[in-house]
Amino acid sequence: PQGRIFVDSGVSQYAPGPMRKYVRSSLAHNVVRVNGDEQHELWGEFRVGARGKIYEMSIVNADDISEITLRIQPHSAVRVTWCHTRIITLHPAAISILDRIEVPENSAVESSLQLHPDVTIERENSELALNREGVTVARMSVIGADTLSLEPSVYCPDFGVEIKSLWICLQQQGAGVVEMKVNIESC
């Protein structure tokens, strides 16, 4: 079975309310949050106040491997100043995502991965089997997270369409350099 495994939430509506707030949030976009803070300061349904700043963005290709590095610091109004580096390494049949968060004081770090609604999860020892149509299409392992949970989410593939789905929540409590890594191998 072919198809997406991970998605962002999409946009369901522009009307004020909980759904509009959710689809604009960091939680809906496969990024890191620290102490629940957003990467950008969101105002109302359409406006953004202080914005996160990208410090580094690079792509390195060597043989069959590509490495994408992004480094962002959130907006200036966050409670604790932090910096997030994400390194995505693409192999022919695998992807690894390393999140490195530099945070000066003990903080709750959370990384989310939104699943496509057609993807189901089975826990197999320390791995997750990612399934589509009852067939395992990939295996995922996690390094460095204190907890891993599946949380309810919503996927909005088109305007006005809301489909229940799940997101994988990785959490770690810490200070200094906090790292969590996800390895995904196709089957």
Predicted regions and their residues:
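Beta-strand scaffold of nucleotide-dependent catalytic cores
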Residues: 6-10
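CBM-like, beta-strand-rich accessory domains located in the C-terminal region of large
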Residues: 11-187
